[in-house]
């Protein structure tokens, strides 16, 4: 079974190091056949991340994008990772700012996906702490968290000829739909999710498999206080993993 994991660093170097270290502690680096790790010319301190990635045998390559693009480049880089690894059985999409809190997360996701032949992909249960699901009100208030689209924070996609065609023609990137009174922003993977539905394929959201997700660390969207809290938590966890 060939699994390709794809992740992008976008000024999130400490978070990505934590993601990799927590993955290695819970799933093991060897459980993934190919690691397609990219960096968007990050301007934060990348030294510890690059050193750890090199040590585990999964060097990080430049994506060709920078941190100052006028658009969200995430889906474009994920597409690049899929197109460069066409012979994989599964693709694992990983946000840089997730932390693995459960053992054998990926084999369990694959098993759940394989139990549903009408599903093209599966994402984890959304969680802020890796222990509890986010409040129902938060999920209901923002369907883009996981219900209206496959969220790429930790998702497994089954490779099929249809997936390859849609990745080539539709991609995983963002779109904007224009209406007379407003514009609708379609976040990463949302258009792909909608097109998959026209082919009678759904995406799953696990009820029990979860990771901790910091959310919104690549862009300056949080208050200074919340951003500092996330960074402090990340550093605390990194100290524990680094020993």
Regions found by a protein language model. Give the residues of each.
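Short beta-strand-to-loop acidic/aromatic patch adjacent to the donor-nucleotide binding site
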Residues: 88-99
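Active-site-proximal specificity loops/subdomain of glycosyltransferases
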Residues: 52-84
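Short glycine/serine/threonine-enriched helix-capping/active-site loop
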Residues: 63, 122-127, 206-207
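Conserved catalytic core of nucleotide-sugar-dependent glycosyltransferases
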Residues: 101-180
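Short, well-formed alpha-helical segments that are part of the catalytic scaffolds
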Residues: 12-27
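C-terminal catalytic/acceptor-binding lobe
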Residues: 175-243
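Hydrophobic targeting segments
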Residues: 2-7, 23, 34-37
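A conserved acidic beta->alpha catalytic loop
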Residues: 38-49
């Amino acid at each position: 079974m060939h699994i390709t994991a794809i992740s992008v660093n976008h000024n999130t170097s400490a978070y990505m190091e934590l993601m990799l270290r927590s993955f290695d502690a819970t799933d093991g680096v060897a459980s993934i056949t190919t690691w397609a790790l990219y960096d968007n010319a990050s301007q934060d301190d990348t030294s510890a991340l690059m050193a750890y990635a090199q040590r585990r045998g999964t060097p990080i390559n430049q994506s060709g994008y920078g941190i100052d693009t006028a658009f969200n480049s995430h889906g474009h880089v994920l597409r690049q990772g899929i197109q460069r690894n066409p012979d994989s059985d599964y693709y694992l999409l990983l946000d840089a700012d997730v932390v693995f809190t459960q053992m054998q997360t990926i084999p369990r996701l694959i098993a759940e996906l394989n139990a549903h032949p009408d599903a093209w992909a599966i994402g984890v249960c959304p969680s802020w702490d890796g222990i509890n699901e986010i409040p129902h009100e938060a999920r209901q208030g923002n369907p883009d968290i996981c219900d209206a689209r496959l969220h790429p924070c930790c998702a497994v996609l089954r490779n099929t000829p249809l997936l390859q065609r849609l990745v080539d023609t539709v991609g995983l990137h963002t779109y904007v739909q224009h209406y007379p009174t407003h514009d609708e922003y379609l976040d990463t993977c949302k258009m792909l999710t909608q097109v998959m539905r026209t082919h009678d394929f759904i995406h799953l959201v696990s009820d029990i498999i979860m990771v901790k997700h910091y959310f919104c660390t690549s862009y300056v969207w949080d208050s200074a206080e919340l951003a500092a809290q996330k960074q402090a938590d990340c550093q605390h966890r990194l100290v524990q993993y680094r020993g």
